[in-house]
């Protein structure tokens, strides 16, 4: 289904496909997920990061916008995932940053309820600061040379630890991935 959909959109000239995501059941209507299940409204839902990997392989021009929450993950992981997707899509990836709104998501990830609004947004700001440092401040533009003759893939002097020590996140090292076509997703 997903690869066929992507091919049809690509052939028809669509610019992009946006895939929303949530980490919990959409249970805001009457406190239960029945309506979401009955209408397939955000449930069932597959991980869009994995779907886009397959869809990118069968398309040439279609861009992909993906929702990923900045509330329940460490920023080091999505930074790496989006870099990989940007390589796979050849620069056709975008990130819809959200702070999550569902108590069910919080419960699914070990909390009793959603974090307070202001805390989610403060954490999200630091999350974005970390991803920006990883994407833009870790590898210099010319760090990768792929020089086979001299057995030099990348210059260690041009790859830098970001040394982020914040309120919520500690990221001392460099980004594990070399820069992608966009470096930072749209």
PLM-predicted stretches and their roles:
Residues 1, 47, 70-80:
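Short, glycine/acidic-rich beta->alpha junctions
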Residues 1-58, 184-185:
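N-terminal beta1-alpha1-beta2 module of alpha/beta enzyme domains
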Residues 11, 57-60, 90, 136:
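Residues at helix-coil transition
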Residues 16-18, 54, 61-67, 90-96, ...:
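Structural preference for beta-strand elements that scaffold enzyme active sites
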Residues 18-25, 72, 98-101:
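Short, solvent-exposed turn/loop segments enriched in Gly/Ser/Thr/Pro and often Arg
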Residues 33-36, 63-66, 153-159:
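A generic short-segment signal for beta-strand/edge and adjacent turn/coil regions
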Residues 37-43, 63-75, 114-118:
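The substrate-binding groove and active-site-proximal loops of carbohydrate-active enzymes
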Residues 74-186:
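Internal, glycine-rich beta/alpha segment that forms the wall or movable "lid"
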